[in-house]
């Protein structure tokens, strides 16, 4: 699993603000507005306990601190426990947390202790980035290119199919692409005869996975994938609306989904 680095999370508040203004330009709503409209829920200062976890590759510098800044940005009352792991979980509950946020190297979860609802970051991230892309006000058709059909990309592509979009899918893993084509009934995209899209959704751990041949002027590229799916040069050349942020939008999706 591709893990975040402390560098990915630098200036998380600036990254969130920048992503929010792009989301507003693309959909007419800010991230809060999209989450509220999509999930039908609104935060009202729920107490969120953020528990650092030392397993596997261990604690990621400023991961917990970023989650605190993100939860505050979206209207929650949050704290990071002083202890990690089991002791931290105990500390969070004893200090009145209604929602637990914690992540090991494979699963990043949000658990609402009051209503029992639980969310996983990977599907929640794919679905919210796909939802934002699907709300692009200037889209010229219902055709979408989805690049990367893994733990984040597949749920996002499935969400776009469910919303009635014509999804053209691509993944470097041919077997996975074939399975996704049959599971979701999407069209396999062939890089050898490309066409241009006004909506592109990318979720891969590789850079430059969206070729120039598929980019149309002012298209939306909604991409949780890290590193970025296109170069700064291509983004400027085509006036691409790039929705890309390392942690906050996916975390908001998790939290709104369990309220
Ligand atoms: N921004 C955010 O909030 C979040 C970002 N992520 C990031 O999203 C990315 C995807 O995560 P997962 O879905 O969990 O990974 P995954 O490994 O389950 O799926 C990635 C997929 O991309 C495909 N792929 C790799 N290189 C490719 C290429 N050049 N062209 C086409 N397909 C290619 C792989 O075959 C794989 O199927 C990672 O970079 C991860 O760090 C994950 C969660 C949240
Ligand atoms: N155990 C560590 C956190 C590990 C998080 C690993 N997961 C990722 O990097 C995923 C989450 C969103 C994007 N990638 C800590 O508590 O500091």
From Swiss-Prot:
Record carries keyword Amino-acid biosynthesis: yes
Enzyme Commission designation: 1.4.1.-
Gene3D superfamilies per the UniProt record, alphabetical: 3.40.50.12150, NAD(P)-binding Rossmann-like Domain
Domain of life (superkingdom): Archaea
Keywords: Amino-acid biosynthesis, NAD, Oxidoreductase
Deleted gene: phenotype: Cells lacking this gene are unable to translate UAG as pyrrolysine, and do not produce pyrrolysine.
Entry-linked InterPro entries: PylD_N, Pyrrolys_PylD
A matching Pfam family: PylD_N
Pathway: Amino-acid biosynthesis; L-pyrrolysine biosynthesis
Residues involved in L-pyrrolysine binding: 4, 53, 60, 103
Binding site residues for NAD(+): 151-152, 171, 206, 224, 226, 245
Biological-process GO terms, alphabetical: pyrrolysine biosynthetic process
Keyword Repressor applies: no
Reaction catalysis annotation: (3R)-3-methyl-D-ornithyl-N(6)-L-lysine + NAD(+) = L-pyrrolysine + NH4(+) + NADH + 2 H(+)
Family, similarity comment: Belongs to the PylD family.
Role according to the record: Catalyzes the ultimate step of the pyrrolysine biosynthesis pathway by converting the isopeptide (3R)-3-methyl-D-ornithyl-N(6)-L-lysine to the 22nd proteinogenic amino acid.
Protein name: Pyrrolysine synthase
